[in-house]
């Protein structure tokens, strides 16, 4: 099947590469010539395990192409995926300019039937706006009778596991009201559903809502567990034991029950804000989501609060090792990362920060800038050397079983703040460390 994907960011590139992997002929369009040049030279602008290999393989096979040619891209695919960004505006609403610009380009260049697929996370009712924009462009060209359909097909990709999620989806949500489009979408996704039919067909607005509802629910679980962790510390309970206890209930499940330093990234913060804004537009105050957002912002300060409790408010002359900068493992994404809050707060109190991340260091340098008191270490061991304490912010696998003897010798004092509860407090205490976790007894 011939497919066009508009946008070569996180969503567009992963979607295009995985569709090509299943034998489709995919053209990925982007107006950013620099990004297209990088892709054509074999570069990958984002860190995502498995993506580089799948892109290279399908480019070599001739199934995946990159271009800035709008007219040729629109002509290529019957299916036109829109996978551009929807960044938040100042009021929390999703900025729709890129989605509508893509729709307008399709309307300006299409000459036959197209299925326009909204893959980006978009506000409820976007399909109607996309349809109106395309119809307006067709009418201006005297082609008002040209048939097309608009479909909502939200992505449910986890950064760090996006290729796996795309190739083996747990569900495929399709919102559509056009039978021809439904048949084409089912045919496109049939190779992804050989073991069971995972396609969930619904109306357009329900499909658009499903994406926001899913991310809001996951963000709620994270903030709820972080709230319980704060209480656990006060009452002498261990949130890790509580997590296992409640996660064994099948009505609750084991996922997204980990206390930590708060959520970040490109999706949860943006989508919670957008859903709050949508609710307000329709006269519904989503009070739970307000609390989720507030709790998450507070949680990003929890590690520094613990540092202050140990060292006092004035941290001048102190150096802290920081392990992990990306908002989660297996990505270089620094958007809304808790580490940004931690670094800002430590520097504001006069401390020096020596940070290490196995993947996100370059992106962190770009985001955090060249600031007095901040340096980037070449390894976890280098970051810890001579530091007053270690703060673990992102749970990269290489941090799970470090050389604790070497770490103890490297630090001025054996003091660790475990922001992701990946270490065993009893084991570290036995080894002579002072341990502070999130929601751990004595934490």
Show where each model-derived region lies.
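Structural/interface elements that position substrates and couple domains in central-metabolism enzymes
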Residues: 1-443
